[in-house]
Amino acid sequence: MLTANLSPVAPPVLGPKATGKLMNHRPKRKLNFKVLASEFPAFLPKELENIKEPVARKLASRIERLPVPLSLSKTSIMSSCVKPKTQLDTTPLVLLHGFDSSCLEWRHTLPLLEEAGLETWAVDFWSSYIKRPMTLVGPSLGAAVAIDFAVNHPEAVGKLILIDASVYAEGTGNLAKLPKLMAYAGVYLLKSLPLRLYATSLAFNGLPWDTCLDWTNIGRLHYLLPWWADATVDFMISGGYNVSAQIEQVKQKTLIIWGENDQIIDNRLAVRLHSELQNAIIRQIPDCGHIPHVEKPAAVSKLITEFVRAESKIGTQRLILS
């Protein structure tokens, strides 16, 4: 994103008969042209400049696009990701995000995981760039994506980490039957600031007003991308994810993390999920709501790091973020 800063230049003054000849009544002034580069990639919404939280701004500045080949087409799509600062030949850790969210929800936990010696990529790139079993992390609806992927591509997933998992909903339910016009109306309602403020207050415990407003604005940035509405409507009418029948098919060792004060998904479902998975452990985080990796990043980072390194060589891992 570039901005131009032009100093004022005196306009040409025409002679009495408007002959088109310039009359030098004023001294010439030198044109001063400055180009100011934004700290953010040009494809991100300009509203990102208004975000106050330093860690959100820092992570956003690292987002870039890479081509991802499609199996059903000769073309590639450009997918956004945060690339690793360093790349090592080790086990990747892949971070998904929840529904109606973005990779910025990992802004607090990602730096801690990197400090622990973990790297960053994105799940979209597995077949093209990773090509080895990974530890897949899915928060909220991202947990349904993780389970579906682990069951259908077991060769790609070594371990699972599910955070406040939304895995028992029957897809998008009756929303799948909505006429497209009504679906678009509902999607645009999701953009409203009052609704998003309410959702943020439900997701986190006791946020100060200025933090709640800034976090709400961070959570709304993806709405400003031109394809967001179409993609969300397509997801709604597709029926969404319904993975409850797949849970018992998961063979990978799984860590379940849950905020004890989750007001969006009942934490009793954590116990149910633990009982239905073949090989799982469960850890609950006190005084924490629906998004522990934002609210309690140190606790989540510690749990993830210990789980990734358990039963494997203690060393640097690869962390992948989408």
Where are these regions (language model features)?
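Alpha/beta-hydrolase fold catalytic core
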Residues: 1-93, 115-119, 125-131, 244, ...
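Serine-hydrolase catalytic-loop signature spanning alpha/beta hydrolases and amidase-signature enzymes
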Residues: 88-90, 98-108, 120
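Alpha/beta-hydrolase fold nucleophile elbow
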Residues: 130-141, 145
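Flexible "cap/lid" loop of the alpha/beta hydrolase fold
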Residues: 147-190
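Hydrophobic, aromatic-rich cap/lid helix
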Residues: 216-243
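Short beta-strand/loop motif that positions the catalytic acidic residue
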Residues: 250-251, 256-258, 262
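Catalytic histidine-centered segment of alpha/beta-hydrolase-like enzymes
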Residues: 264, 283-303, 317-318
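Post-His helix in hydrolase/transferase enzymes
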Residues: 269-271, 278, 294-310
